[in-house]
């Protein structure tokens, strides 16, 4: 990618780039513990394989179950708000990671107090600037809508 810069490298697990003003993270195997082969769910794009949005949402659910970063919450928020419903994300996650703790689908989604950063804008220039409290409120409202279905 000619227009890129490395913004974070956590060898050997992950490397973050800004490519054409978009943050892109590449994970190695083992960066986030998942019980499925992520490579089976990728599609080729130029010289790399990428996951489609539904699998990225599953990886984000696994990420927030293991660590709390504003980036993961923001990505999951954005996917749930603009690309697929939270119910679809939860159902897909239950299919691909059946042993993920049920607490992830409720308390973990809405508990953002232990995230150090207040907003994703401290790191990047996101499409939508929201605080961690707004993200928690969004997930709370979405969970209320689907409480009988999960």
Each language-model region and where it sits:
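Compositionally biased terminal segments of proteins
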Residues: 1-150
